[in-house]
């Protein structure tokens, strides 16, 4: 039985972690900052959606 693709990719990254498979530290830093910005944006959108749902449910018929 073959392992899932994500598992093989993770093991590949772990095996090649000793080698500098990132071209530059700046690129890694840029990707980390992009991931953080996307994560914060998703959290804000989810929070806004949740508050709107709560307000709509609380107001009832209006």
UniProtKB/Swiss-Prot annotation:
<feature type="transmembrane region" description="Helical">
    <location>
        <begin position="30"/>
        <end position="50"/>
    </location>
</feature>
<keyword id="KW-0812">Transmembrane</keyword>
<protein>
    <recommendedName>
        <fullName>Protein UL148D</fullName>
    </recommendedName>
</protein>
<keyword id="KW-0472">Membrane</keyword>
<dbReference type="GO" id="GO:0016020">
    <property type="term" value="C:membrane"/>
</dbReference>
<keyword id="KW-1133">Transmembrane helix</keyword>
<keyword id="KW-1043">Host membrane</keyword>
<dbReference type="GO" id="GO:0033644">
    <property type="term" value="C:host cell membrane"/>
</dbReference>
């Amino acid at each position: 039985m073959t392992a899932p693709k994500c598992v093989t990719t993770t093991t590949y990254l772990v095996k090649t972690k000793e080698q500098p498979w990132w071209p530059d530290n700046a690129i890694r830093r840029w990707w980390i900052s992009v991931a953080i910005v996307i994560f914060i944006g998703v959290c804000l959108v989810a929070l806004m959606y949740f508050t709107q749902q709560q307000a709509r449910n609380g107001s009832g018929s209006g």
